[in-house]
Amino acid sequence: MSTATATAPKVWTTEDLLAMPDDGVERWIINGKLREKPSEFPEVKMTVRNRHHCKLTIRVGATILSWLDTQQKPRGDVYGGELGVLLPGRTGTVGIDVAYANAGVVAVQDDDETTLLAGVPTLTVEILSPNDYQEQIHEKTREYLRAGVAVVWVIDPDDQTVKVYRSGHPAESFNITHRLPEHPAMPGFAPTVAELFE
């Protein structure tokens, strides 16, 4: 009689992710599990977003930058375009559409050539794309909150809504007629939803 032994599933790390080929497949790691989504354009060896997604990414980043320009130094920084983030205490890397990292997080980065941000952003923003799966977005949102991100925005370009997630609070949805709640760690930052879509 033979006994089959079950092997534990592989726990993926950032090093594993960085060693993967650049083959047009979008990959990220959540809770040590590899997530993959084939590119809409496999002949292009990079993550490709539609122009509406890209425009919204810029608008959100510009809105944060406008607020940031009113703040005293030292200030944090704004990142966009699938920023790779190493969240402390989490297994793996996540890609974020737009993120604001405060001055403390920015100050501890190794150098400007680092491809990944190490630390917890103050605000993360996910912009839904037509090929995003709701469960993947919810999983990423939960991962951000567990890692200590204070506020997560999930923007739906089709409905022109923003869903705001905060640890310990139920998610809140805001439409084009609303002002977003002020971020607790970003005094005075409370843009209207309309500003993000104008």
Region roles according to the model:
Residues 1-198:
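Gly/Pro/Ser/Thr-rich low-complexity, intrinsically disordered segments predominantly at protein N-termini
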